[in-house]
A protein has these predicted regions:
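Fold-level signature of zinc-dependent metallopeptidase catalytic domains
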Residues: 23-175
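Exoplasmic/lumenal beta-rich domain surfaces
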Residues: 110, 320-380, 449-473
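The catalytic-center signature of Zn2+-dependent metalloproteases
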Residues: 112-136, 174-258, 324, 329-333
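Proline-centered linker/hinge motifs at extracellular inter-domain junctions
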Residues: 285-290, 319, 388, 410-413
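Extracellular acidic, Ser/Thr/Pro-rich low-complexity tracts
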Residues: 299, 310-315, 392, 434-441, ...
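A short beta-strand segment in extracellular, disulfide-stabilized domains
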Residues: 303-311, 429-432
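Extracellular acidic loop/turn motifs
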Residues: 313-320, 328-333, 381, 395-396, ...
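A cross-kingdom C-terminal cell-surface attachment/processing module
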Residues: 521-536
Length: 537
């Protein structure tokens, strides 16, 4: 049947035929089937060595690898029971995996010639058991399909097998090696991104040399599945090589985001370089994006901050950006332990955006005064390392790193007044904040800028810039319609800021006039004051 996928307003939309053949399902990625029933994958082989940071993907070359994908009889039966139906399902799967690998690591897969000879239709006579033992059987099946008389499976660089009951299992860094067929994925519902991304792209990532990126140890994140040298993501993590949805209370979300962490890209590109003679190189008319993460800073503990970078592309391609924390530390073992202990990662991986900025903790968390899972206040004297990564969508991926030194001054830089008092448009308002030692070394913030938002942080109006970081300043509240607002005090030459914890009411100043206007003004103000007092009571 017809299969399609496209991007709509930054979200992936899929079109797949219903199994009864009586129509089509159109759905967003996050509405796909849930992840594989709390099944963890396993990694076979030695752990990859820790790598130094490097330019990720140049963008002017793409590697094409030939892949052989075997299908157990149960997988083929799920998709209609014929070789043609099984081959069509594998083609749909590969199209989705290709989209991710082309964009993130400049690699793509071409199905091996004669792949139909390793798609089995009979569950009783096929060479597989529909479990994780199929990974060993697959090595033999694919070797025999190339060597036995009467078979016609062509040469390939990487092999995999799909079934409906085996979970995930793969050899680490086996692409273009003698163990190249050591990869398998199984699910009772082998369709959609829960299968294509969470499992198949994940297991092939292992075959490319990428290890797990989660730092949690509950649920399936336990049992030795955490890899300390690559545990960049809090809790279950959310990138492809993490374990979103199968780590119990440490789950950040139900399914993986369809993106690799930059550290996974490093590992995969390193293995691709080690087997550089394998695969076919394709020249691209493309330049890698340019990206700058900005300067290093010193900030106070328990205080929000915003990371700001910049990017450009010689080809004028629209860029997408991710800010990732790249710190390794102590594993977490519960939600309560996902806090700052001086070493562990504090901030989760999030999907790329069109702007090279990220507010930490996230703005929704600040507005609700409730941290999202996968966010924690930097509370100790420590160093935070961050990476800005830019993607051009064509395989060009560039990154730049910066660091933040966190200093616990004993207090948070925080707005202290007004907290509930309404604001009067057109009138002078005094804003107070706790300096928290930020005007002294080593932070040395001497000036602050004061802002107001009427739309919960979508837009900010500058009220006064370059004011002394003394803890108090007077500003004029802009004229405008009645409503609500929040205030912000931000260090002029640093990243940290303080924001109103609650919405503040804004009312219009009533101007006096001739005749009875003065009396009207008096009674209007009196009634307004009475209303304020009732609201505060």
């Amino acid at each position: 049947g017809f299969h399609a996928m496209f991007s709509h307003q930054g979200r992936m939309v899929f079109v797949d035929p219903l199994r009864n053949g009586e129509g089509y399902a159109v759905y967003y990625q996050q509405d796909a089937h849930s992840r594989l029933e709390e099944e963890a994958d396993r990694v076979i082989g030695s752990k990859a060595s820790k790598l130094a940071r490097q330019v990720l993907v140049d963008g002017n070359e793409r590697k094409r690898y030939v892949i052989a994908i075997s299908a157990a009889g149960e997988y083929t039966q799920y998709h209609g029971g014929t070789v043609e139906a099984g081959l069509g399902a594998i083609t749909t799967l590969l199209n989705r995996v290709n989209e991710v690998y082309q964009r993130d690591v400049a690699a793509e897969f071409q199905l091996a010639s004669g792949n139909d000879t390793i798609i089995f239709t009979d569950t009783a006579t096929d060479p597989f058991n529909n479990d994780d033992g199929d990974i060993d059987a697959n090595v033999t099946v694919q070797q025999n399909a190339q060597t036995q008389a009467g078979t016609k499976l062509g040469p390939f660089d990487i092999g995999h097998v799909v079934n409906t009951g085996g979970g995930g299992l793969a050899g680490l860094g086996v692409l273009c090696t003698a163990e190249k067929s050591a990869g398998m994925t199984g699910s009772p519902n082998p369709v959609g991104d829960a299968f294509f991304i969470d499992y198949v792209a994940h297991e092939i990532g292992h075959q490319f040399g990428a290890d797990h990126t989660f730092n949690g140890t509950t649920g399936s994140c336990g049992g030795g599945n955490r890899e300390a040298s690559q545990a960049w993501e809090p809790g279950s993590g959310s990138s492809i090589m993490a374990y979103a949805g199968i780590c119990g209370e440490e789950d950040l979300q139900a399914n993986s985001l369809p993106y690799f962490h930059s550290k996974s890209i490093e590992q995969m590109r390193a293995h691709m370089a080690r087997v550089a003679s394998c695969g076919t190189s394709q020249s691209l008319t493309n330049n890698a994006p340019q990206v700058a993460a900005g300067n290093d800073y010193v900030i106070p503990a328990n205080t929000p901050f915003v990371l700001k970078g910049a990017g450009a592309d010689l080809d004028q391609d629209p860029l997408s950006y991710t800010w990732e924390q790249i710190d390794l530390g102590t594993e977490s073992f519960s939600v309560a332990s996902m806090v700052d202990d001086g070493s562990r990662p504090l901030f989760r991986f999030v999907a790329p955006t069109s702007a090279p900025e990220r507010t930490l903790p996230s703005l929704p968390s600040l507005l609700t005064n409730t941290l999202a899972k996968g966010e924690a206040w930097p509370a100790t004297n420590r160093e935070l390392n961050f990476r800005l990564t830019a993607r051009d969508g064509k395989g060009g991926v560039s990154s730049d790193d910066m660091k933040i030194q966190v200093v616990n001054t004993g207090k948070a830089f925080a707005l202290t007044s007004p907290l509930v008092t309404p604001l009067a448009a057109g009138q002078t308002q005094t804003i107070d904040w706790d300096v928290a030692g930020t005007n002294a070394a080593p932070i040395n913030c001497s000036k602050v800028d004061l802002y107001m938002t009427r739309d919960e942080g979508v837009n900010w109006t500058l009220l006064a810039g370059g004011q002394p970081n003394s803890g108090s300043a007077s500003v004029t509240i802009p004229a405008g319609s009645d409503g609500t607002a929040r205030l912000k005090v931000a260090c002029s030459d640093n990243l940290f800021f303080a924001i109103s914890p609650l919405k503040l009411s804004v009312t219009q100043r009533v101007e006096g006039g001739g005749g009875g206007g003065g009396a009207l003004c008096f009674w209007t103000l009196a009634l307004a004051l009475l209303g304020w007092q009732r609201r505060r009571a």
